[in-house]
């Protein structure tokens, strides 16, 4: 008999097609997206309810998963389900325009917001780590981070290499749910990529889904591939089986001895969770898995020391004049806590490359076809091009995405668009559902990593102009406004991306079912959501955001005086 409430060998896949298993599309949508998060083609470890990002789960236990799905199937259009850290705790009477689901995951009072306290609660069955889109049921597989990574690499190429990454190579670590986007994003940006990953099954998964081109078992083998591709001007990627905390320092040693040097260095190991996400040097994956059960503290101590070694190497690359960036997994903070004083010598990716986009409310807009039909996504791709004819960069992205990105679970698309354009696209998609161009409704959401929905001083809000990095009123206001505006489900999480104590963030998803009611909700939600990002950055003193707010006619009395 299985006594672990978080383990089950069931295979979960979202229903496809126009038939409902809930009372309306407003409850069918969260039901399908929750199930899609645990699709074996989507989730990193679905049998343990883990979607991505270390232990980012979709539900607290399998019993909770069953209770959530049962509640969603019976929920009326005037009721709202409350989910507390992956557990369905209440159904309350609300109204038709209210969210059908409100979710709060992993939130702790600040003084107690530590991994030690969270792990204690988690062990007792009182909490669940929701990451960002795992516990908010809008994870779309590795595609969800591809364009953001692509935009980052393109901007790095523009700043450091005259906009041309041909013949250049990027060194990184981690091929999990988020990190797995890096090799494909690098190739799309015109560069080669060497990605170090300690778990061979993850490399094989990325090979199968065409996110990485080749696998190597030794550093020499991987470097030979990189050398061949860069000399030929080809953009290709290799996943190297190894530990980043060993490979990065070894590459520094070789570089100092006149060996190969990468052109850009970053990392997306699951360093945000030292206990569950990072493999210590000298340990096997199996050994770490066993020790996490028998002696979790020893894993954490060893992992932290290894992270310091990796960051020391990254600082050495930076000191050698190589563009080096933290990709938001809090690895610099851990290294600093371990005594590495100059751990923050190199910048995070948001202040270095992404913030000007956030100032205009531009961020990771995404949608999924509840029909399960890829043609619905291809039709929406065409609609995006039609409605945004002058955005050639976006057109290029959509063309590459169609050619290179394999759908995982329900077909989905991500594209970075901003204030005004999100609303325009959402209304157009709703019209396509209404007139039968699409075979079923779609859901529209985003990552919590967005312009106005997150406070994370070591990632999205690092080095804010006015010093407001740690002010977390903004994601709270974002969640409240999306609730008031009529999003289909709204989530408020803590600790995503960078780990306990380092972030608070909000998510929203809205269903376009073709109705007039949906039209009104889409109009409000898809304007207000990115507008909070423009507001937040305008308040911090960014001129781009101030200009955008004025151009779009935002009323910001305490900021613009209107």
UniProtKB/Swiss-Prot annotation:
GO molecular function term, any single one: urocanate hydratase activity
Pathway: Amino-acid degradation; L-histidine degradation into L-glutamate; N-formimidoyl-L-glutamate from L-histidine: step 2/3
Main location: cytoplasm
GO CC field: cytoplasm
Transcription regulation keyword on record: no
Named cofactor requirement(s): NAD(+)
Pfam families given in the database record: Urocanase, Urocanase_C, Urocanase_N
SUPFAM superfamilies named in the record: Urocanase
The enzyme's E.C. designation: 4.2.1.49
A Gene Ontology biological process term: L-histidine catabolic process to glutamate and formamide
Cofactor annotation comment: Binds 1 NAD(+) per subunit.
Active site: 415
Positions annotated to bind NAD(+): 53-54, 131, 177-179, 197, 202, 243-244, 268-272, 278-279, 327, 497
Role of this protein: Catalyzes the conversion of urocanate to 4-imidazolone-5-propionate.
Similarity comment text for this entry: Belongs to the urocanase family.
Protein name: Urocanate hydratase
Organism: Chelativorans sp. (strain BNC1)
Gene: hutU
